[in-house]
Curated annotation (Swiss-Prot):
Catalytic activity: 2-amino-3-carboxymuconate 6-semialdehyde + H(+) = 2-aminomuconate 6-semialdehyde + CO2
Function, as annotated: Converts alpha-amino-beta-carboxymuconate-epsilon-semialdehyde (ACMS) to alpha-aminomuconate semialdehyde (AMS). ACMS can be converted non-enzymatically to quinolate (QA), a key precursor of NAD, and a potent endogenous excitotoxin of neuronal cells which is implicated in the pathogenesis of various neurodegenerative disorders. In the presence of ACMSD, ACMS is converted to AMS, a benign catabolite. ACMSD ultimately controls the metabolic fate of tryptophan catabolism along the kynurenine pathway.
Family the UniProt entry places it in: Belongs to the metallo-dependent hydrolases superfamily. ACMSD family.
EC number: 4.1.1.45
GO cellular-component term (any): cytosol
Annotated positions binding Zn(2+): 6, 8, 70, 126
Oligomer status and interactors: Monomer.
Organism: Sus scrofa
InterPro entries documented for this protein: ACMSD, Metal_Hydrolase
The name this protein goes by in its record: 2-amino-3-carboxymuconate-6-semialdehyde decarboxylase
Pathway stated in the Swiss-Prot or TrEMBL entry: Secondary metabolite metabolism; quinolate metabolism
Amino acid sequence: MKIDIHSHILPKEWPDLKKRFGYXGWVELQHHSEGEAKMLKDGKVFRVVQERFVGLGTLPMQAPXSLFVHPWDMQYWFPWLIGMPAETTTAXESMMMGGVFEKVXFAHGGGSFPFTVGRIVILGTDYPFPLGELEPGK
């Protein structure tokens, strides 16, 4: 199964890639109304992209299937040491605040999210004062 998770944002003046590279199969967007575009492959419409799907991508919010988020890049092992926990936490918190959790599961036990949730300001920690004050409010 292939999952389409990119956001389908292309400028209106996108070049004709079939003409440029000499073969078909390129995806293009036809901006046909405010906040919507038709996604075309070889001139045939296969999906309408609505503005509300741009941030996360088209398929995850339209399809009945779930979305699994898993970061990957192995240079210096940073992803395993700090990247996966931090990036997974950032993704989890952004999606939680955006109300997008109906069909999503995160890798690595949610990264460091379970351990940092107490520091995330959602009417918690030092709210409404800046984090890290020795005596909050003074």
